[in-house]
Amino acid sequence: MKMKGMLLASLTLLSGAVMLTACSANQRKASDSKTLYLMQTGDILSLDNSNQANLTQWNVLEQSMEGMYRAGKNGKLIPAMATSIVKPTNSGRTYTYHLRKNARWSNGDPVTAQDFVTSWRRSTAPTSKSGYNYIFTGIKNAEQISAGKMPPSSLGVRALDRHTLRVDLEYAMPYFNKMMVMPAFFPQNTGYVKKFGDKYGTNSARVACNGAFKVQGWTGTNDKWSLTPNTHYYDRKNIRMDKMVMQIVKDSNTAHQLFQENKLDDAQITGTTAQGLQKNKNLMHLTRGGVYYLRMNLAENRAFSNKNLRHAVYLALDRNELAKKVLSDGSTASGTYVARKLATDPTTERDFATEMTPSETFNMKKAKELWNKGMKELGKSSVTLDLVTDDQTVSKNVGQFVQSKVETNFKGAKVNVESVPSKSSSGKVSNGDFDMNLTLWLADFANPVSDFDILSSSNPQNYGKYNSPSYDSQLSQARRNGNDEKAFWQNMRNAQQLLNDDMPVVPLYTMTESHLVNPKLSGVLYHSVGETDYTRAYFK
């Protein structure tokens, strides 16, 4: 997730969207001709976008909820709840959205401007647990509200009437419309929020959906659920599937087997499973705008409060070996926190990640020297490190790779790999109970600042406790330089250089997903940035 900042006006949202088309046929039961079988690799933590934010949740919300716009082919904005693409006024600081009057929730209630106000106020409140309140920065008073200095009612968003929403910004954000496709900005049924209170979104019966489908059968803990068409959806005539069935599948071999048995129409695979299927005609590679990395815990009582130890780990990991021999799914080595091909620096016309990659990304001799130096500075002869991952097979494999390299090459190092379910790993990490955490950041936008924001000292997702006034200053300047291309990208380069120097995160690889896809499946939008859209899917 997932997910998820400020952008330059010229950014391209959801760049590289691919429309999937069919070429041949899988055998399916006639009764299943309008049922789409899908998998997710992790648990849903909640359907409340103000309370949680992870990749599975956002994938589900993409099919069942809509904001002002949808992302179409090649990332083009398509009016959804809004009737048109809004042009700002007041020198770029005011957006007035007119909502379509035929938009309705799955329970029949009309979608109103107040539903957006309800959602955004809940998401910016200091009690929000999604970790995404920072994404509202730039909307009037959002930062002060999240810091507990102002009430949520002071947020710069107002329902002028039942179908008109006004948003006031603190400074011009020419990319603001592009943010409206994110699940963080989706509305919430005000009546349901009032009715269920803290239990809103804790199961599928406690949430209403305003998108093409509605979620059914999710109890809050189960690993299989379905989505059926929202009969009140304004574009119901273009929804062809009668049902989507989703299940959690964390193992690639299991995913492959289910695909072979026609129990999955889209199976994500990795590792040796993917390696053995590279010539399969149903295999599709999707490069995503995200990097898997090690989040280092910089707290004072932790070993990685020492910068030399962090740099030692960075230089000890052969990312090409990891990508080719462990992952084998098309993922590529990454030496920077920003994914390759995510964004081009327009002032240099170079790929940002490429131009900012350190000159050395693997040097075992130097790594050992830095490790010994760091251990001496800490006054220790040995150290035990806790590496927390989720319990997907691929995460376990990467964790074991890191464990092997660190224990084999660093004197006195022992690594405990804890591979636990997403809910457990999320809790351990948010509580600071880790030394290293294998995690993914999938950019919300095709711009480096989408990645950089979560490492600012005030960001609720900065679980590694990185605190750099210089880094914070670069991000603050970038937000206000949105209309000054040269200044903005200099801020971006400065921020990445600080990460290269401080190493609060150890980048590993740019995410590439390998999918086995039913060749009869068509109408799916796969995005390099953002969630896959199955709402207009059909079988040919």
Positions of predicted regions on the chain:
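Ligand-site clamp/hinge motif
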Residues: P229-G276
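Structural transition elements
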Residues: A333-K373, V394-K396
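Ligand/substrate-recognition segments at binding pockets and active sites
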Residues: G220, M364, W371-A443, E513
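Gly/Pro-rich hinge or "lid" segments in bacterial periplasmic/extracellular proteins
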Residues: H163, L169-I239, K243, N253
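Detector for C-terminal structural segments
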Residues: A316-P346, T393-Q403, S430-K540
